């Protein structure tokens, strides 16, 4: 049995659990703490250390952490909804020193997409799978034949001279009071553009609004099959843990 801890750091909450990677499931309670005000590195590291202590490290060699940032070789290159002091930080080393284990940092959308490819809605799918998370912005993950292509930022594709996410994310629907039908027209424009660039085999749609997929998914007019995410709130945790073990190998 291969076990690892997955940690999902967000702007408002930090959650984690122990994952059985062979079974593709949580084998502990999912523990959640509030993200410290300001999202400073030291405070977040302390909160993660507390969470890991509550989960327990017995039999655990690897910890994966997903984070709302572009991550290159364990270094956070951007910061969304957390302190800008994260930019350029060697997160792998800082967290590894604090927790006494090998740490692997990844982008949060990448972690969620990888989990869906390994254990969720895209399990067994060959070719290119694109997961998008529709929320405040549009997060994205590209997985080709099971291999993650890290740090895609498809929410920043330009449509009519502006970032697509400012016009097509779920936050735009809520802000402008769009019906699901009106929003689906925008999503059709967005996903057709992505299709023209990348020709994926499957789109997986995540984010909190994916719980309401029956109200809008069938209205998006694209040629690529489109399915809702299956793992929901556990996707980041599971993907971070799986990528930590894969990275170690």
Question: How should each PLM-predicted stretch be described?
Answer:
Residues 76-88:
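A charged helix-plus-loop insertion that forms the helical arch/lid used to bind
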